[in-house]
Structures are given as structure tokens and as C-alpha cells.
Amino acid sequence: GKEIETTLNNQTFTPFKGGKKHARDSKIVKDIETALRQAGLKSGINPSFHHQLRNGDYVVNNAIEAVNNLGVKDIRLAQTALFNVHEPLIDYIKDGVITRIEGSVNGVVGDFISTQNPLKAPVILRSHGGRWAAVKSGELHPDIAIIAASSADARGNATGLLGKSAFGNIAYSPVDAWHADKVIIVTDNITSYPCPFREIYEGLVDYVVEMDQIGRVIGKMAAR
């Protein structure tokens, strides 16, 4: 066959050898603490989460524990919703790790906040659509979006439709992935590339974290 020039106008190009011939760099890091550190976690920022695992979610608690372990305080929690499973957050509120919240708050965390007034600013309660609009408009800016996915590949293509912890589509996080400074995918099922039914695209993702289980898919307190 004919030799193809790979250098043109002082630029070097890689010849096309087929759709799956070139290796892709993995974005998998050791754990959520490593991902947060590399993403530039610092005091005063806004980490965001979705609530699709509802009262079975493990990702929010795991991530905020990592925030605490890194010695970071004064964060604004920008989740779509909290449930009884997030009761451990009460201690982080008391310790000043979480000082502001924007999003729906249910169950024991809501009871604690409404009766004890422990935050330095009033909670801003947002409907799911209202939160989407706030992120899109810039009124609420997620510095680091932490997105639970039931399956993802090493490049960050992710879905909630496959895997042992499948919970349905990742309905409330695409807007976070589009606008956040850094995006972390947290999954308990790493798939081959490309992840089927991807809802979050690899070009938006900075880090991928694999944990043993992202949550329990249960129905109680499962209001969307």
C-alpha cells in the first residue's frame, strides 16, 4: 500500500487504523478521596450529587466522609435530595464540614436542620426542575459533580441502567456534568469500553472511582 505522510505543516498525525485500534487512557483512580484531592477539593466549594438511589444511597455518605478525612470544611452540599440513609451527615453538619445546603431534604436530616438551625445559612429548597434551571443559569455552580452510576467504563461513559445496582436513568446529573469544573463518576461495575446506554459522556468526566457498592435499590422513601 501507499505510505501516508504522518507529519504535515510541523504537526504529527496518527493514521486511522480502525475504531478500536488505539488504546484509551483510563481515568480510574484509587478511591473517592484520591479523586476529590486531584479534583481540587478545598474549603468553601460546592460538591453536587443526584438522588436516584434514594434511601439506599451510599455515595453521598462515602464522599462526605472523604471530605472530612481530607480536613476540608465549610462546603455547600448541592444534592438533588437527602433521605434517612444520610443521617451520618448530621455529625458533619455539627462539625462544620457542611455549612450550607441547596436541595431537597427529607427525613431525619431535615428534622435536625429544622429544629436545631445548625447551618450558617438557611437551606435553599429546590424542586428537581428548579435545581436544573439554577445550575444551567449559573445561580448554583457545582465545583465538583460526584455522579453515582451503576455501570461505567474506564473512560467515564456511564449509565444507571445496567449492573447490580441499576436504578434507572441518571436523570438529574447531566446538567451537573455539563457545568461542573470537575466530574467524578462513582460506580460498582466497570464495563468494557464503550459502556452501553451511556448517559454521561466520557468527554465530560475527569475521574472514575470504583467502590464495592454504590447503594441498595429499594422502594421506601423513593419519591422522585
Residue ranges and their predicted role:
Residues G1-R224:
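Conserved alpha/beta enzyme-core scaffold
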